[in-house]
């Protein structure tokens, strides 16, 4: 029991600390000698980096954010593999603990005054490591929302909202045990909720018709 608690704590800690390494802030400060959080939406994610510093900055940010999600989950999986097979712990607990706290670290980074990004790409990196088969479906959902509207935020919220649904469908098709299904449902639900919560201002602007649209005329 104590070993399981220590492993869970180590998983949470490493994921949060990795998540706190905010690529957007680092790139904006060390490459562009500025802080992206002082511009645009105030977030430190790829979208605001693209709007503020351009495609190269956005690409570097996206790569870093996805990789830290992948790495956090891989470490969490490795740590939980140290538990004996008869420990009665779902193998999905480690990966979802890592995913959730990597996203949390990105949202509230320890090293940067607890003000970071919105977690979409970190979550995508985590999903790439947990259930890569879901990413094409999530990408389609994103594009279906983005292409006609130009709103990245709408695509992000739609992906987040439907991720738990896709997770449950996938788990059912794969014949997950009840305990594993519960962990996956709760874990994906937490990830979804965090991303949607961080987009609450965007959701309000969408309702008011004021949300930023890429490639379209934006009202001032």
Residue ranges of each PLM-predicted region?
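Short, non-helical or kinked segments that cap or interrupt transmembrane helices
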Residues: 35-43, 111-124, 151-162
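Loop-to-transmembrane alpha-helix initiation sites
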Residues: 136-138, 152-160, 178-188
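C-terminal ends of transmembrane helices
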Residues: 24-27, 105-115, 141-150, 200-204
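Cytosolic, membrane-interface loops and tails of multi-pass inner-membrane proteins
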Residues: 25-58, 204-220
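Helix-coil boundary and interhelical linker segments in multi-pass alpha-helical membrane proteins
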Residues: 1-10, 74-96, 128-135, 169-186
């Amino acid at each position: 029991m104590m070993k399981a608690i220590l492993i869970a704590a180590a998983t949470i800690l490493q994921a949060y600390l990795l998540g706190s390494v905010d690529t957007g802030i680092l790139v904006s400060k060390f490459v562009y000698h500025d802080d992206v959080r002082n511009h645009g939406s105030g977030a430190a994610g790829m979208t605001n980096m693209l709007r503020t510093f351009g495609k190269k900055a956005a690409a570097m940010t996206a790569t870093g954010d996805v990789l830290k999600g992948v790495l956090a989950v891989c470490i969490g999986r490795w740590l939980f593999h140290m538990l004996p097979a008869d420990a009665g712990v779902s193998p999905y607990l480690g990966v979802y603990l890592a995913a959730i706290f990597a996203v949390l670290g990105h949202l509230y980074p320890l090293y940067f005054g607890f003000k970071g990004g919105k977690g979409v790409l970190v979550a995508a990196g985590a999903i790439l490591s947990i259930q890569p088969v879901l990413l094409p479906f999530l990408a389609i959902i994103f594009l279906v929302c983005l292409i006609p509207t130009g709103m990245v935020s709408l695509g992000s919220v739609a992906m987040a909202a439907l991720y738990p649904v896709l997770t449950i469908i996938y788990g059912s098709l794969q014949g997950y045990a009840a305990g594993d299904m519960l962990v996956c449902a709760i874990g994906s639900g937490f990830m979804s909720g965090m991303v949607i919560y961080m987009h609450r201002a965007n959701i309000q602007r969408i309702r008011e018709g004021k949300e930023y649209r890429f490639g379209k005329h934006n009202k001032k």
